[in-house]
Amino acid sequence: MPSYVTRQKTRQTFSWVGRPLPNRKQFYQMYKEICMKINGCSEIHIKVGQFVLIQGEDNQKPYVAKLIELFENGSEVPPKKYARVQWFVRFCEIPIPKRHLLGRRPSAQEIFWYDCSDCDNDIHVETIIGPVQVVALAPEDEIPVNQKSEETLFVKLSWNKKNFAPLPPEELAALRRLECQKPLEAKTKSVKSPSWSTAEQEVKRIESSHSTSRSYQDPAHTVTPNAMKSLECGGFTRKPNMRLSRKILCDSLDSQKTCKRRAAFSETTSPPKKPQPGEIKTSSALETLGKNGHTQPFFAKSSMVLRTRGTAVKTTKLTVESALSPVRSRSRYSVAPSVGLTPQYIGRKAKEQETHKEPIHTSLRARRRSSLLTLKRIKQQLWLLDDDKSDQEEEESISSVEVSDSSSEEEDESVPSPPTGKPVGQSRTRRTASKPSSQTPSKSPKKTFRPRPPLHATPQIRDRNLAVQEPASVLEEARLRLHVSAVPDSLPCREQEFQDIYSFVESKLLDGTGGCMYISGVPGTGKTATVHEVIRCLQQAAQTNDVPPFEYVEVNGMKLTEPHQVYVQILQKLTGQKATANHAAELLAKQFCSRGSQKETTVLLVDELDLLWTHKQDVLYNLFDWPTHKGARLVVLTIANTMDLPERIMMNRVASRLGLTRMSFQPYSHSQLKQILVSRLKHLKAFEDDAVQLVARKVAALSGDARRCLDICRRATEICEVSHQRGDSQCLVTVAHLMEAIDEMFSSSYITAIKNSSVLEQSFLRAIIAEFRRSGLEEATFQQIYSQHVALCRMEGLPYPTMSETMAVCSRLGSCRILLVEPSRNDLLLRVRLNVSQNDVLYALKEE
């Protein structure tokens, strides 16, 4: 879509047209038409039933709606102007998970009838940007692609938040009746801008001077006697210093851009002249004079020549066509060359015979720009052609244009003309006709074209070549079921918490309001799993119309590099766009805090909330503040491990916005852990009953962490499988296997490292403890410890090591982080400390 008026800082004023139609029941005054004045220059009359553009979050893609009513609320002081609309939605406004339901690639100009009544249909009149043309099509029709329909929108389907459907017959008929009415331009009354009127006065002054003044001949151009005679009768005359200033010309060009482009290349009365090989033609028109005397704006992107029709003057029959060609000033210090209008005279006979022609030299930069524009348009046309053979012909024409970009004839003929009812084959015939007829066939084989990659490739995960292997044994099946990521059929022992969270979110969805809930509990108590189960059940209920549809977004504080990145993650998952943290926070605040901006409720799950804490606590404040706004459809579910997190680290203004809706997940008891294990191992005999009872009681006494319990059982199956392969036990997890797994799980890594250390390393640790007890300090030098080490070796009858060997032992224990040592350059004065308690060292060194 092109840029709209909202990008320019325009001043719009609105006024009613006609008499009001009072509504005594609602104290409203209804109107049928409103006048919108832009910058005091142009007036646009908009009636009920027309389609309008409405200001939105993105200026490039404003909202589209149909006017249903125009009214003024008399109860307000001062009275405000309102409009009731029927919304349309663009494809980018549809939630990302549901865009695949369309089943095809949408057009950039396609919109959808919004068939849902849960949004606010009353808007302020000041938010209207202007009218827009909307064309209704049948579902099987194709959207036309041409220059004339750039600012036209097309509607084929409707969207009801669940799927796409064809337009209702009555709505389709109503939309097509609107198309048969008076076109949009007839309702727009434009006031001439000063710049354009100045240009018109200048042209009229030039016309009036033809009959009285002598024609001035430019030395660069030659005029035949016939042309001179015609000029004396009433043709255009050029005076020496008569030039339109660059400012007047640019202002006239800018004022024309606001009007709709109606003219086309086919509007010229005479056939286009064919340039000679050495001539470069840059064709355009500033204005085309019709038979009625009115000016019609006409632009082309690569335009430079200004033409007028021969039928512009009624009173005089001219035999000479006048063309205004630009004359660039040769000023050396000007930033941009000023353009003057020079009448250029071309006789009809000379035009038909193509004998009197003057080459117009253009700069290399302008030629390069025109060539690139030609290539761009040809490539766009190539994508629209489905025939492979025609594609190859177009690519050959592209290569010919690239080689000879200095020839403007090929550029002019290669540009696809605007739609004038001619088939595509005619333009292809013209291009092939311009080539020499006698060509020697190339002996070398044609260049083979590589297959093009798809225009819009969809990234996807690679398919699995081999099927997933089935578990080979009972123990392997048990390990799969006991994995933390395995989703069980149900969540036992959390029925009450599930019901409370479900009721809270369901009530907010039904009421269309926002809220916040704080969920706390120690790790492994099922907080995240319970919330996921609630969301899954609510999504199933939304598919059966039991609850309104909603959008679900989940962020985890552990996956963020910085707390403010939570804004970026939320915005990307909601809209699919990327932005900086500050800009994303502004967009989210505008979406959640403005009334009527949301059409669906958003459920936001924030896991590991305590990791989003900052010094100013602005992230937590915004997350808790957004649901409190009036009309904000945002439900925030926060999860943290600390029960008193709001009172301990949050400010009062942040904790107050959190609300009183809190829930605490208590640690699992031994009976609950046993029930969880039994439900996972349902119909699978892999554990002894006593083993399950033992691991449940052990874990419940320590932490009540269900994840730790599942990990211990999985490790026990691995130990059992290894012992079964050696033939030591049967394929059943016993109490001994579980005790071994529990010892591995709950024992410290430092204790395990000390137990597995060498005799010399264990002797050095005993020497450290002996020196600490002797000195009464928790720190000693390497020289003092070495003396104790030598004494202990003599008492035990062991050969004592050298100083270098003892230094190597100390460095190894320091690398294992069992000791805290200084750099070895201190040598004998190296200070040594224990990184674990003395009791743990003595426990690891005791003889069993």
From Swiss-Prot:
CDD domains: BAH_Orc1p_animal, Cdc6_C. Residues 349-360 have a biased composition (Basic and acidic residues). Phosphorylated during mitosis. The modification N6-acetyllysine is found at residue 314. ATP binds at residues 487, 521-529, 608, 641, 707. The modification Phosphoserine is found at residues 193, 252, 270, 284, 325, 404, 407. Residues 488-848 are annotated as: Necessary and sufficient for ORC complex assembly. Keywords: Acetylation, ATP-binding, DNA replication, DNA-binding, Magnesium, Metal-binding, Nucleotide-binding, Nucleus, Phosphoprotein. SMART domains: AAA (SM00382), BAH (SM00439), Cdc6_C (SM01074). GO terms for biological process: DNA replication initiation; mitotic DNA replication checkpoint signaling; positive regulation of G0 to G1 transition; positive regulation of smooth muscle cell proliferation. The keyword Lyase does not apply. Residues 191-200 have a biased composition (Polar residues). One of its GO terms (cellular component) is nuclear origin of replication recognition complex. It is found in: Nucleus. Residues 434-443 have a biased composition (Low complexity). PROSITE patterns: BAH. Belongs to the ORC1 family. The BAH domain mediates binding to dimethylated histone H4 'Lys-20' (H4K20me2), which is enriched at replication origins. PANTHER family: CELL DIVISION CONTROL PROTEIN 6-RELATED, ORIGIN RECOGNITION COMPLEX SUBUNIT 1. This is Origin recognition complex subunit 1.
